[in-house]
A protein has these predicted regions:
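N-terminal post-signal-peptidase region of extra-cytosolic proteins
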Residues: 82-89, 96-105
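Short consensus segments that form the blades of beta-propeller domains
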Residues: 90, 131-135
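A short tyrosine-centered beta-strand micro-motif
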Residues: 117-124
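N-terminal secretory signal peptides that target proteins for export/translocation
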Residues: 1-6
Length: 227
């Protein structure tokens, strides 16, 4: 039936194919370099550390989704972690790595609601315990914290970071945003790519960790199957 349809009505078949392609494309996430000013609600101490170049992420239909500012020269760990499931072991737990502004209400990697607004991002690792088993194959995360209560650029101990991050959700759990390996990054950065197996979108961009440029992959849409 489909073969007869395409044989006798090639123009209609082509139009349908283009329609499906356009529909799929309209659901894409896209990333581009921008120069949106760092939000004023971030403290001057942290604002001074952030790059003036940002990454703009557009959601389905091209609507504004979020803006990301990474820290210029993120301090590298003196002894990088090589623990199982850690892909970004040169990052230091509790360190300020950047800031993010969401234009719309979003869901984090645990499917928790996060309101539109500006947040700091600190690096953390998923604890190895029964409460987090099966959440992700990868232990690297950015945790959101409220900028009006997180004004110092000092490293935070895990518990202090978790306490602050809990204030960005209504569930009593920190807001976690998964970092994935950069091997699926598009050729041109910044860029976004979909993981169809796990049904999430990640944005990939360069960040300077110590003296080395590092490609990071941050999941910005989609959540763990086992939150």
């Amino acid at each position: 039936m489909i073969r007869r349809f395409t044989h006798f009505f090639p123009a209609v078949a082509l139009a349908l194919a283009l329609s499906f392609a356009t529909s799929a494309s309209a659901q894409d996430y896209k990333a581009a370099t921008s120069a949106v000013p760092v939000p004023p609600e971030i403290s001057s101490a942290i604002r001074a550390l952030l790059s003036p170049a940002s990454t703009s992420v557009a959601g389905p239909g091209g609507s504004p989704y979020c803006e990301i500012w990474m820290r210029t020269g993120i301090p590298a760990a003196a002894q990088p972690s090589s623990a199982l499931g850690v892909n970004y072991g040169t990052l230091v737990e509790g360190e300020v790595v950047g800031a993010i502004h969401f234009d719309v209400a979003v869901k984090d990697f645990r499917n928790q609601s996060v309101k539109p607004g500006t947040y700091l991002m600190r690096y953390g690792q998923q604890p190895v315990d029964g409460n987090h088993q099966g959440v992700s194959d990868y232990r690297d995360f950015f945790l959101l914290t409220p900028p009006d209560q997180d004004a110092s650029a000092d490293i935070l101990a895990d518990n202090a970071m978790y306490v602050l991050s809990r204030k960005t959700t209504t569930t009593g759990h920190p807001s976690v945003w998964s970092l994935v390996p950069a091997d699926s990054a598009p050729a041109s950065l910044p860029g976004a790519a979909q993981n169809t197996d796990e049904n999430f979108w990640a944005v990939y961009f360069k960040a300077a960790v110590g003296s080395s440029p590092t490609t990071l992959g941050l999941v910005i849409f989609g959540h763990a199957a086992t939150p």
